[in-house]
From Swiss-Prot:
The keyword Cytoplasm does not apply. Keywords: Host cytoplasm, Host nucleus. Its main location: host cell. This is Non-structural protein 1. Disulfide bonds: none annotated.
Amino acid sequence: VKSTNLMAFVATKMLERQEDLDTCTEMQVEKMKTSTKARLRTESSFAPRTWEDAIKDGELLFNGTILQAESPTMTPASVEMKGKKFPIDFAPSNIAPIGQNPIYLSPCIPNFDGNVWEATMYHHRGATLTKTMNCNCFQRTIWCHPNSSRMRLSYAFVLYCRNTKKICGYLIARQVAGIETGIRKCFRCIKSGFVMATDEISLTILQSIKSGAQLDPYWGNETPDIDKTEAYMLSLRETGP
């Protein structure tokens, strides 16, 4: 039911941006909307609700109304792959938070070398997770913007650090087998807490990220507390982890 509501919300919001979609993409979104309505009718026997109700519930699951955001004003990011650095393009996008799971709200743990954008990339069945090495903060948001170079859409769930007020990572589903498939991959990755990888090393890193969020003494904070986080990290430097 929740997945259907989320898909209803995503399809509706994407169709509101038809001017950004090419013909092929628009047809795929319409197909996704049709299949979601069919699922809604199937579920009506045990979870009766209207299409409008599904959209509203999907919006609540995303925890807020989608906002039109400008390009973030921050240091340009880059990702190193095979010895080469590639810039990360933070284009104007629609941003909306997804949920308030406390495990994903741990304070950020910054590096002390000042390198905010040291990043690594993980791949899993068509989805790519880019995670900066200096942050253990998971404020989940959706970031959906058109990729003008290929005239297609990329779907990215952004991890936003609530302490440094900067983007700390994101999960992208490439348009391989259709829009609906790509978005579902993103949902599955987020629900699993990112404990997935294609090799043992990446799996170990991702597991440590998730366990670190649970073990950090400040992970339950409802509001950012940069002073406490910095003091905690300084104590670790002085006494050792």
